[in-house]
Amino acid sequence: MEIGSAGPVGAQPLLMVPRRPGYGTMGKPTKLLANCFQVEIPKIDVYLYEVDIKPDKCPRRVNREVVDSMVQHFKVTIFGDRRPVYDGKRSLYTANPLPVATTGVDLDATLPGEGGKDRPFKVSIKFVSRVSWHLLHEVLTGRTLPEPLELDKPISTNPVHAVDVVLRHLPSMKYTPVGRSFFSAPEGYDHPLGGGREVWFGFHQSVRPAMWKMMLNIDVSATAFYKAQPVIQFMCEVLDIHNIDEQPRPLTDSHRVKSTKEIKGLKVEVTHCGTMRRKYRVCNVTRRPASHQTFPLQLENGQTVERTVAQYFREKYTLQLKYPHLPCLQVGQEQKHTYLPLEVCNIVAGQRCIKKLTDNQTSTMIKATARSAPDRQEEISRLVRSANYETDPFVQEFQFKVRDEMAHVTGRVLPAPMLQYGGRNRTVATPSHGVWDMRGKQFHTGVEIEMWAIACFATQRQCREEILKGFTDQLRKISKDAGMPIQGQPCFCKYAQGADSVEPMFRHLKNTYSGLQLIIVILPGKTPVYAEVKRVGDTLLGMATQCVQVKNVIKTSPQTLSNLCLKINVKLGGINNILVPHQRPSVFQQPVIFLGADVTHPPAGDGKKPSIAAVVGSMDAHPSRYCATVRVQRPRQEIIQDLASMVRELLIQFYKSTRFKPTRIIFYRDGVSEGQFRQVLYYELLAIREACISLEKDYQPGITYIVVQKRHHTRLFCADRTERVGRSGNIPAGTTVDTDITHPYEFDFYLCSHAGIQGTSRPSHYHVLWDDNCFTADELQLLTYQPSAHTYVHCTRSVSIPAPAYYAHLVAFRARYHLVDKERDSAEGSHVSGQSNGRDPQALAKAAQIHQDTLRTMYFA
């Protein structure tokens, strides 16, 4: 993959992504199956045409119907027996050339419209180029290097795109496409999520260039859709009303606001016009009920009179509204004042829910979709058999053959590291299947807590004083056993109410108790208090806080208290464990800094809230301690805009902590999709270099830039049943794959560094986009597994992505709480998307700024 210049041609040198340095050999070999299916492709040229449809900006579904109608209509004169495939946007491929002039051809097409009228379209088709699948074979076998393999260009001459379009054409016509997945309405099953939403099951399908061959990645998929039902019923679900007949009065303001939030933007169809089911998009819910909501009605004599919606429906349709006391939907454009009573509207089928699911809905979704690895393996195999690619006329047209057996892959299970604890015995723990026990062990470096406070935001009735006393006694016992002694009783223990009392209470504590190390905050469930505690503690006053849910105070368990101690120790500067020094990889022989970076974006459809970029850096030689830096930036921007200054801050902090300058920088970048690789690498690699040079003119540490991807659909299964681990039958922690299903020539690998508890384990995909340090495959895979996955402070388990990338995600997520505007926070609890609308960039930047006393700690743990 070549990385071109962002400026004028030749202004910057090309950046070349490193080729694979060889294959890993370390670890115990294991036989695996991957949900990748080989696609045999002929060595032929296919023909690419650019399609332009007017009117434009139609959904892909409509574009597909237009092109399908056009192909049928011009079958005799143009298309003959050819079966073209189309990507729904601009690219159409044929196996044989079309008889059209080089200048192109303009054609007419129609689709049936509402009310019996046809919708006319103009379609222009123009030849672009031949696309060579022979060249693709050359690339896959390593005989030639291609242009970047991208799937996102509007008109792509990339042969991979052509393969993808062929295999997606028929499913796109049969099912509801969402991204790279296909869904169909539930038949024979029902998985309601509540709130008018339900689970739809489907399958993911994408083509991947792999070693020597093309692979088709197939996986089961699920997402939330809105239930097709009467709007009245939808409103009842949203507002938790069991029977609308029990709602004789108009909706309250809070009910109206809640229902507006849920239904705005959805399509509804009317039921009062017989078979003519006209569709509208909802823009609002009226304040007034149908019996009082008026609009200007023009009579036949030209006179305009005011009519209520209820009157109009009675006069025009002889329809006496059953619920005139309920509001109306305002549909179409707001300025046009088109109102529909709720009772004549249905939610249109097939609308995906892009809004954030509630906690309960997320929990229901996980339960409905979690499958053990063997079950998922069987379901994927069934999906491939039922797809019946050998009978797909478009697959046949282009002479493809899709094998229906999963790819056989040889993986390796990397050895787990030995972890050093502290205390007199300096005990060593060896993880088994990604898990180890801390019982009988003490933190490597435990903190002594001499002054601490408790703020209880649960009511005294919920959490009585004797319960608090029991909790603190047990916490002190567990913490002492863990080598983090908490001395005496808390210097302050008071009840409080509401988010407004957080800041004055914390200020009082800071001013009254010099040397206060920790405030333990007890929360009464999901509440805005949490966001305010973190805002005040992290950004305003620089105080360490640890929140605990009241249910865990009332019913304590050694496990919960032990997990609390893991967090508290590192927040106060302690170290939980380290890799046994003699086992550390050779990269640690010189100063090395591990950086993790992530950008979190606001929920879909919310363009006003900012994206948040976070970078963390290791601050010791273990690496165990980390510092963080965070910035707000333009919504939905993936490149970290201020990366140079963020990395500079962390390099300075590393030097202050260790008195060394790193000779190597290992940069784990989360959240980047393949289509963004070139752009993000080009900008961010230069930013890291700029940070180094800004500190010292000749300072050029070796940089290794690795993208960590979790949002993919590759799954690995044990070929040998006896090697399955746990109740879910997953692959062992440490399983790595860098052959067969990986990139034909670039440096990438899959690593499952954690033990799957529920459902099927998802291995992380690592793609090395830059490597000054010339790591071997073994070195980088071991570095990613041993120190990076086993030093995450929240638990005594190895985690699914490297600790620095995980911490960056936590920092960005915490910053969302810092941006919550407490005055406008909803009663639903700390809604992490924030309430930052309308605040200027300077105010947002200031709100996200961490207090100087907190900055050097792992406050985000």
UniProtKB/Swiss-Prot annotation:
The modification Phosphoserine is found at residue 826. GO terms for molecular function: endoribonuclease activity, cleaving miRNA-paired mRNA; metal ion binding; miRNA binding; RNA endonuclease activity; single-stranded RNA binding. The keyword Transmembrane helix does not apply. It comes from the Eukaryota. It is an enzyme of class 3 (hydrolase). CDD domains: PAZ_argonaute_like (cd02846), Piwi_ago-like (cd04657). Its main location: cytoplasm. Its EC number is 3.1.26.n2. Residues 230-349 form the PAZ domain. Belongs to the argonaute family. Ago subfamily. Required for RNA-mediated gene silencing (RNAi). Binds to short RNAs such as microRNAs (miRNAs) and represses the translation of mRNAs which are complementary to them. Proposed to be involved in stabilization of small RNA derivates (siRNA) derived from processed RNA polymerase III-transcribed Alu repeats containing a DR2 retinoic acid response element (RARE) in stem cells and in the subsequent siRNA-dependent degradation of a subset of RNA polymerase II-transcribed coding mRNAs by recruiting a mRNA decapping complex involving EDC4. This is Protein argonaute-3.
